[in-house]
Amino acid sequence: MTEEERIFRGELFASEEPELVEKKRRAHRLSQKYNETFEDDAEVREAILRELLGELGEGVCMLGPVRFHYGCHTRVGNHCFMNFNFTVQDDALVTIGDHCNFGPNVTIVTPMHPMLPDERRGMVCDDGVERFLCYAKPVTIGHDCWFGANVVVCPGVTIGENCVIGAGSVVTCLLYTSPSPRD
């Protein structure tokens, strides 16, 4: 089983395995390339995002800088807006619905360190090298959500549709769909 398969099964994985390191380096290079491209060069920026992300909807606007851990584990819906310093540690899958807006400095995190002391210590992997292991839990964000500045979304969180997350919030658990005024 590959380390990436372990991630998606919710098992401990070694984030420094060569297969994962190369995917992260690719994402970091593409994130940097995006950040070095001017906002008025929309076609180039969109092409970079399409290469970087697992899925990218239509009409997405991301102001730089952006940072993605893997990129390929992130799916972004249609007509989303991400303000400055949008950071996604997408070890596990991150799914963002349509018409979502993110204020500056929003961070979405999927990796988490083990809670048990024995698991936090370095473990010898199949190749005989001692590595530190971690888990990752997916994050799912429904359609029509709005995130204020400096929001942190923690591993394993599901946010329903039409939710408003106030500035400075740390989201640690399920947020149910909020009724829409159109309903």
What are these regions (language model features)?
Residues V66-V76, F81-T158:
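Flexible, glycine/small-residue-enriched loop-and-beta-strand segment within the central core
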Residues V171-T172:
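Short hydrophobic beta-strand element within catalytic cores of glycosyltransferases
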Residues Y176-D183:
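Conserved small/polar residues in nucleotide/adenosyl-binding loops
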